């Protein structure tokens, strides 16, 4: 029967729970997952309020666990390992998932395992119908992180480049806020961009020709603010064009740096993960560039691009399979709000 692993994600504003079954060296299989997003709750504040996020995780995580067990036809007593997001993320939010996982594990006498949030994103395409093979270059791109990693196997990660200021997702969200598009801004900006011209505004592409694999998006955000102020009363009529131009600037940098990472490493496979990985323009441009060069690009299923419990259960299963980490029965836990991925290997 292999191992039945319950994964809990609570690092920010999504509460996710999932069950994965791992049998021998076979690819782990997702049995069920459930997710609650706090987007509606945080909309009134224009962003995530950490205290409210933690309280909502407390309300949601146990009912979601019950929902997943029922959907999979499993009992809590059948679970072999409990996995949770140890970091990075909001400290209070992380403590909710860690606390529940360790409490359940202690009550059941089962082992527990803390997982790196970004490793969950990085490995999430292994749940897709077209999973990648090692080694590959990973573009981890979300509201809080923008990194390029060389991935030679589970737990074998080398940082190639990262943002020196704002993450790509943050650039989407803050630009959207400047345009009055509400929260969450990234998806709203991407939808509006489909109606506009990507060449209407000559926005900067920071570090595009820097020769390294680092990113910078703070200057782009400032340029968007400048355009918003220049447009004044004309902003409503030009908003779609500004959204399209902003999206095009972010995507061009992401695509060029990712292809440069492939050239630098000599690898021919890309994994794109994180919330921004769902962006249509990013997928279209990467797919086109890879098709022209005979390269392979892999994405998670769209439903698994945002934070979710499935990626945490999967990462735990793959770490156990690879023998890079053992689940333990020391139920004293801590969380790591700041935790470089390479340091978790």
UniProtKB/Swiss-Prot annotation:
Its main location: cytoplasm. The keyword Cell membrane does not apply. Keywords: Acyltransferase, Cytoplasm, Iron, Metal-binding, Transferase, tRNA processing. GO terms for biological process: tRNA threonylcarbamoyladenosine modification. Its EC number is 2.3.1.234. GO terms for molecular function: iron ion binding; N(6)-L-threonylcarbamoyladenine synthase activity. It is found in: Cytoplasm. Its cofactor is Fe(2+). It catalyses: L-threonylcarbamoyladenylate + adenosine(37) in tRNA = N(6)-L-threonylcarbamoyladenosine(37) in tRNA + AMP + H(+). Substrate binds at residues 140-144, 173, 186, 279. Fe cation binds at residues 117, 121, 307. It comes from the Bacteria. GO terms for cellular component: cytoplasm. Binds 1 Fe(2+) ion per subunit. Required for the formation of a threonylcarbamoyl group on adenosine at position 37 (t(6)A37) in tRNAs that read codons beginning with adenine. Is involved in the transfer of the threonylcarbamoyl moiety of threonylcarbamoyl-AMP (TC-AMP) to the N6 group of A37, together with TsaE and TsaB. TsaD likely plays a direct catalytic role in this reaction. Belongs to the KAE1 / TsaD family. This is tRNA N6-adenosine threonylcarbamoyltransferase. It comes from Verminephrobacter eiseniae (strain EF01-2).
């Amino acid at each position: 029967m292999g191992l039945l692993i319950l994964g809990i994600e609570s690092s920010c504003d999504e509460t996710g729970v999932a069950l994965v079954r791992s049998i021998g060296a076979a690819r782990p299989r997702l049995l069920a997952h459930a997710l609650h997003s706090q987007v509606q709750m945080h909309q009134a504040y224009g962003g995530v309020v950490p205290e409210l996020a933690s309280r909502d995780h407390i309300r949601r995580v146990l009912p979601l666990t019950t929902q997943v067990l029922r959907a999979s036809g499993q009992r809590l007593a059948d679970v072999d390992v409990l996995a949770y997001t140890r970091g990075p993320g909001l400290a209070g939010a992380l403590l909710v998932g860690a606390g529940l996982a360790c409490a359940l594990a202690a009550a059941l006498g089962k082992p527990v395992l803390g997982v790196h949030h970004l490793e969950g994103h990085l490995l999430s395409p292994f749940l897709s119908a077209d999973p990648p093979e090692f080694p590959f270059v990973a573009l981890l791109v979300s509201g809080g992180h923008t990194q390029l990693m060389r991935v030679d196997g589970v737990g074998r990660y080398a940082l190639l480049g990262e943002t020196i200021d704002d993450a790509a997702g943050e650039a989407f969200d803050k630009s959207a806020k400047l345009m009055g598009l509400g929260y969450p801004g990234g998806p709203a900006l991407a939808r509006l961009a489909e109606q506009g011209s990507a060449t209407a505004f000559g926005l900067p592409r920071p570090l595009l020709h820097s020769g390294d694999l680092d990113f910078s998006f703070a200057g782009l955000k400032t340029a968007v603010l400048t355009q918003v102020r220049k447009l004044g009363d004309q902003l409503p009529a030009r908003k779609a064009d500004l959204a399209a131009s902003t999206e095009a600037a972010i995507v061009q940098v992401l695509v060029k740096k990712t292809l440069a990472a492939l050239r630098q490493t000599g690898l021919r496979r890309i994994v794109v993960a994180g919330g921004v990985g769902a962006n249509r323009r990013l997928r279209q441009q990467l797919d086109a560039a890879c098709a022209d060069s005979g390269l392979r690009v892999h994405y998670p299923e769209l439903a698994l691009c945002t934070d979710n419990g499935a990626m945490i259960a999967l990462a735990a299963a793959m770490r156990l399979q690879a023998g890079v980490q053992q689940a333990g029965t020391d139920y004293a836990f801590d969380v790591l709000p700041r935790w470089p991925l390479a340091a978790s290997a």
